[in-house]
Each structure stands twice: as structure tokens, then as C-alpha cells.
Amino acid sequence: MTNDVEMKSETEELPPFPTVHILQVVKDAQQQHGLRHGDYARYRKYCAAKLERMRKALKFTNSHNCQKKRKAKFVKKWLSVESVQNVQFLNFGIFESERRYAEAMIDKITLEDNPEKSRKKFSMINSLRKAVLHATNLEKIVQESERFDAPTKLEAQAYAAWMRGMCSFESRNWQKASESLKLAKTVYEKLAEATNNTTLSSIFKGRCREIQPQLRLCEFNIAESPGAVGTMTELMELRMQMGEGGDSSVDKLISEMRASATSAEVVTIEWGGAKSTVDDEKAKQVVQEWKQTEVELAQCQTPKEKMALFEKATADTRDAIDRISDIIRRKSSENADTTVLQSIKAYLEFLKMNGTASRYLAIIDNTKSEKKSKPQDLLRLYDSVIEIYKEVAEIPGADHDKNLIQAFEVKVEYYRAFRCFYMASSYSALHKYSEAAALFDRTVSRVQDAEGKLKKLKSSSFITNETQSSLNELRSEVESAKVTVRAARLASAAGDVKTDSELAKIIDKRPLLETVNEWRQWDVRNSLKDKKTIPVASLPPAFIPMPNKPIFFDLANFHLTMPNVDDRLEKLQKDRDATPKKAAKGSSAAAASSKTSNQEEEEQQGLTGMLSGWKKSFWGNK
């Protein structure tokens, strides 16, 4: 009894742990170690290295069970309530779970890039199950220990529920995923309301926003029919909320719904003056997708959402065109009729071109909304739009529809006015005011032409984005720009505005030694204020090319023929014979001279042989 009383008193005397904000620990680690850019591999390595460091520092290492005549068996040391001596021990459960979650996301990304690697799906599910195991163990330890406060227990419960929900979500167990995600969202919402810390509140609310799209997708799949919870429009909104890095299951569900919708009905198109029935399932889905895209565009709030819609639709259209081309090639080899298929292919080409041009227009709207947009950027985009609309008339069968040809001629003239305006703005930015004024005048004439053609085809179904109000706005912008250009021209003529050459003189940083023959202006006072020195010479001096000695020095000198001096030698010999003393002296001198001449000949032959050897080694024997 006394021992029990002593143990109880010891446990009661243990101080409580401070509050552990699990989600904040996770978010800080993710933002600092790879997940800011979606690099799960880097994050996994960080979690593994941190676990190894903590096990060594806290002396909580794993062990190996050694047995005779057998390989040592790895025994993992699990976290328990008794082993938690301080708050740092909770990091074992957190980062073990995060490491497994990062491994699962790596497998998921690999599976999305390579759908044929089906084994990666099993690896992903296994990693998520291990992550759930560690998160559940963490929750159990925190709940059973009396040293942790209520916020820590709630965070552990929410984290484990979120991890279970993600595992069920990837396993397509929609019911369990919905229950777990709802629990996690409820707990995080309560924590956000209870805390006074704005940083923690924003983190909790951010996790709730992350859970919401996945929760809606679970509810959508749980319903017996899609209409019970939401329609196709709701699914598209859900995909926009999840963004580009969202789950691929939304796209799969959308394609499945479109496939089921198109398989039951007959899809007909009108192209080249004739109606054709689309039998291919992929082409059916693409035609229905473009119809649905027109409805979804009205719900888009930003140009980026429109860009994503057009990009997805054009990619699917390219795949359908490739499929139809393969069918045409196969039937042509069998001498079968391909007229209907050619018409369908031409119609898909028209959809692709029109969608690509619309995507460029969405990019233009997005570029205009940015602060650092330049007229040159918009000029290139308008060039692309005009070229695409010109190519529409060259599609086979397009000449049978006069309304289509006239409508796209109006489109070309309409966007030429905008291109001319931004070309004039580009010249104005380069201080070429005369050219800019002429182009602004041409813009006015193009606007008038576009207005006249637009009024004639106002009721055409092909003209949707081109409006009279946009032309009126362009006209007002042109008028204000013309006034600005005229004022700039007058200022430059009066000398108030510095030309490019004058600016170049001030900005010129060449040293004075290189510009001795030039007259240069230099503002000495401002240079002294800015502590700028006048460059006199560039140090160190630049390298200049210099001629070097050739590898074969003077080979031509060895081929010179010297004059014959035998007659002089005979005369010299006779003189020596006539005078004995002089001859003796002369003979010794001659012997010395002959000896030196022989040495010179030997040295000359040795040098010639060496150089001839070099010559043979470079060019070979002739």
C-alpha cells in the first residue's frame, strides 16, 4: 500500500507539458523543406534525417534482435506513454507519419505521370496506412497522458482524423473519408475560434479550406446519382478550387460523367455544308466538352480559370484528332469511304484553333491585369490570334459556310485594330513619337473598319467576344494616347526631353583613354554627390592578340646556295707556300678555321635533322 501511495504521489508531482501545436510544426517543416515548391522527395529526406538525429539525441534508437546462426532482426522502438519524458518525443510520431505521407505523395505523382505503373498505387496505399498507424499512435499517447492539455489533445485528434481521411480518400473509400474529414474540419474550426493567436487561426482556417474540396468530392461520389448532390457545374467549380495541383480524381470523374452522358445520345455536327453523326466515343466527349466549356466560362471569375479550361479542352481535342487520323489511315488502306471522318476531323481542327485563339485572348486579359505588362508582350499575343483566325479559312470545308468566313474576317479586322494600337504604344515607349503618331492614326481607321463590319454581322453565332463597347474603349484610349504623343513630340523638339543619344552620353561608362578624340559631357557635381569616379583607364587592361614565333623557325635559310670560294682558297694556299712563317701561322689558323667549320657543319646537320624529324612527325614522309 505504501508503495502505491508513493507512486501516485510521484505521478501527480510530474509537471504538465506545454501546449504542442502539431499543425504549426508540420506546416513550418513543409514550408521550409520542399513543399513550398511541391518537392515531396526533399521533404521525405528531411523527415528521415530529423528522425535519425532525434533518436540519437534523445537516446531512443531502434535495436536489432541477434540470434545464433541467423541474421539480426530489426526491432523498431515504438513511442509509448511511459517513454514520453518531454515534448520533443512527440516529434517521433509527427515526423514518422509525415515521412510516410511524403512517400505516398511521391508514388502518387509518379502514378499520375505514368499510369501504366499500377504497382505504385499499392505502394502509395501502404505508405498512407503506415502514416495512419503512426498518427493514430500519436493520438493515443496524447489522449492517455494527463500531462498534455486540451488543445494538444484536440490537435492530435484532428491530425489523426485528417490522415485517416486522406488514406480513405486515396483508397476511394468515400464514406470513411467523408466521416474522417468532417471530424478533422470540425475540430480545426473549433480551434480557430478558440485561439487568440492570429497565426494559429490562419493555419487552422487554411487546413479547413484544404479539406473542403475533398469533402465535397466525397459527398459527390457517395450520392446515388450525381444530381442529388451537385451537377457538372459544381464539379467544375470544385476543380477550380483545388487548382492545378489538385486531385486527378476530379478530372477522371468529369470525364466519366461526360462519357456516360454522350454514350446515351447521338451527337451530330454540321460542317462543310453537311451534317455528320459522330460515332467515335472520344470525339463525342470532345464535342460535349466544348459545349460544357461554353457554360463554364460564364462562371469563371479570373482569366487564369479560363486559361485552364481552354488548355484542358484543346489537349483533349488534339487526342481526338490523332485518334480520328488513325482511323482514316486504317480505312484508307482498306479502300473504305472516309468522307464523314474527314468532315469530323476538320470540325475538330476548327474547335482546336478556335479554342487556342480564345486561350490567347485569356492570356491577354491576364497580362493586362498585371502591373509589369509591356506593349510588346501583348503585340506578340495579338499576332498569334490573328494568324490563327486567318488559318481557320484554310480548313477543308470551311469555304462552304459563308457566315463562318465573314465572321472570321471580322475577327481578324477587329484584332488588327488592337494590334496596331499596341504597336504604336511600343514605338511611343521607345521615344519614336513620329512613328507612334502615324500608327495611332491608322488605329483609328482600323477601328472604323471593324465597327462597320461588326454591325453587319452582329447576329452571327461565331462573334461572341468581339463587342462594340471594347472598340469604344479602344477609341478613347487612342485619343488620349495621341494627345500624349503630340505633347512628347513638342517637348522633344523644344529640347526638354533628352533623346537616346543624349542619354547615352550620360550613361556612357567608357574610360577616357578610349575616347580621347571624342567630346563627352560629364556632370561633375552630380558625380561627386553620388561618389562616382571618372573612369580614366580600364584596369587591368584587356588582352590583345599578338603574333608569335612559328614552330619552324627559318627553314628557308637552310636551302640557300652560297657562292663558290674555291678559287680564293687556292690563291690563299699559294701565298702560304711562298711565305713559310706566315704559312705556319696561316696553317694553324686554317686548321682552326677548318675545325670550326666542321663543327658548324655538324651543328647545322644536327639542327636540320631535328627540324626535319619534326616536319615528318607533323606531315609525314612524302
Curated annotation (Swiss-Prot):
Recorded hits in Gene3D superfamilies, A to Z, give: Signal recognition particle, SRP68 subunit, RNA-binding domain (1.10.3450.40)
Q: Spell out the residue ranges making up region: Disordered.
A: 576-622
Q: Which Pfam families match?
A: SRP68
What's one GO-annotated cellular component?
Answer: signal recognition particle, endoplasmic reticulum targeting
Q: What does the similarity note say?
A: Belongs to the SRP68 family.
Q: What does this protein do?
A: Component of the signal recognition particle (SRP) complex, a ribonucleoprotein complex that mediates the cotranslational targeting of secretory and membrane proteins to the endoplasmic reticulum (ER). The SRP complex interacts with the signal sequence in nascent secretory and membrane proteins and directs them to the membrane of the ER. The SRP complex targets the ribosome-nascent chain complex to the SRP receptor (SR), which is anchored in the ER, where SR compaction and GTPase rearrangement drive cotranslational protein translocation into the ER.
The record's note on quaternary structure and interaction partners says: Heterodimer with srpa-72. Srpa-68/srpa-72 heterodimer formation is stabilized by the presence of 7SL RNA. Component of a signal recognition particle (SRP) complex that consists of a 7SL RNA molecule of 300 nucleotides and six protein subunits: srpa-72, srpa-68, SRP54, F37F2.2/SRP19, F25G6.8/SRP14 and ZK512.4/SRP9. Within the SRP complex, interacts (via C-terminus) with srpa-72 (via N-terminus).
Q: Could you tell me what this protein is called?
A: Signal recognition particle subunit SRP68
Question: Which gene carries the instructions for this protein?
Answer: srpa-68
